[in-house]
Amino acid sequence: MNKIYYFILFCFAAFCFTACSDDDPEFSGIEGKDHYISDFALNVGGITYQATIAGDKITVEIPYNTDLEGATAAYTLSEGATINPNPSTIQDWENEWKFVVTSKMQESKVYSYTYRYADIEQSGSVVLATQADVDNFAETGINRIDGNLTIGTADGEEITNLEGLANLKQISNTLILNPSYKGADLSGLDNLEQLGSFKLGSIVSTSKNTTLKTVNLPSLLGVVGDFVINSSVIEKVSIPKVTTIGEDLYVASDALLDLDANAVESIGSSLIVKGSVIQKGSATTEAIVFSALKRVGSELAIQYFPKLQGIYLPALESVAGTASFTDMALIGSIAMTELYSAGGLTIKNCKEISTIELPGLTSCGEFSVDANKVNKFNISALRDAFGNMTLSNLLIEELDLSRINFNGNTLTLQCNRLNKIVGSETFNGNLLLLPKSCRLTEFTLEGILNMQGNFECEDYSLVKRFIMPFVNVAGDITIALNSGSVDTGV
């Protein structure tokens, strides 16, 4: 009896399942769940450009100068899926689109469409000697040059605009501008992103181009080699997105008004900015700013700016060579608060400078400051002097040297108001006190017991009391006082 009961129950359940299945769509395997685009392409003028589909991104790569007007789409969906909007209804393929693909089971996936230009590379150097050459370059669609690009000649046909270079994004070697280019700026190179190097003139010779006033490369991101401008007429240099320059950044111009390189963080070799091409201050620049610069691989020099009032290097940490600031009549202060290492430092012919702030400097090579209005001088973190140090004409009255190791080098002090020096117990170097026309009546050396080098002091003609508590002087000692007494333990 039980067997008959279970048999009847089984048949009833099977009947119900069959009845329910008749009411639902029939799916085989995963057929009803798929919601993807398996193939996508655009056809432009009879040419098909196959898309790359990566995840939910559809990207069509087309050559430069390709017009997508009139383009049509071909695509393949998973079986049973639908797409919205329908690509066959779209005419404007220069815009980005989003497509929703929906499966039979109403599961959806969103795809994003975009396009990009394919690189067309020219192997070898390119010379564009005439305006026609520049104009015709646009028709090639080339956006990368694996070599030099030379624009113009020494004295040939004039080139007045660079619009034919609008597609250009990369020059692996040097961009050279010759005098026959007569444009006032570099409009046409607005999309250039990478350069091997840039040459307008050279470090040793001035460009003969007299019409170019502005070097503007708004999209440039990096320079592998040198960026050199040596011109008597350049007024503005604008490379606002460049972050690295592999070798030299050299800018010299009699007419320089503005330099925008505020994204530059690293310069592999030297940074040289001059307000003159003939070592005579001419440019009327009032401020020089490198707000992101951290490292200079060799020399740093800013010089020949008679109107310059501010130098701003707030992020600068290291200069492998000498940092020199010279021939700037109006500069009032130099502050490099993050600088911790310099191969050397020179400040001279800056007659209005009163403040020198180097609070983080811990090591320096040859160090020379000659400035007769400096009354604030901060080198409080200095620990190692790896070259001679000379301070001339500063208005400081006290100087603390107690934490500095001079490593056998010479400290020369020619400061008429300096009346007190504090040193460590052992002074590891030579100390020369050589003021000019000094009118001090008292001078004190405090803390120094052992002088490991030479000691010399001269021209303290009015000093009545000269205190130096030396116990030992390893080298020569010279003391020339016209009057007064010397209190020493030597």
Language-model features, listed with the residues they occupy:
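Beta-rich interaction/scaffold domains
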Residues: 21-138, 142-149, 167-173, 193
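Small-residue (G/S/T/A) turn/hinge positions that recur once per unit in extracellular repeat modules
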Residues: 45-51, 80-84, 166, 219, ...
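Concave beta-strand-loop units of leucine-rich repeat
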Residues: 126-129, 146-160, 172-188, 194-235, ...
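Bacterial N-terminal signal peptides that target proteins for export
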Residues: 1-8
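Extended Gly/Ser/Thr-rich low-complexity repeat segments
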Residues: 68-79, 290, 401, 423-424, ...
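Disulfide-braced loops of extracellular cysteine-rich modules
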Residues: 134-139, 161-163, 186, 259, ...
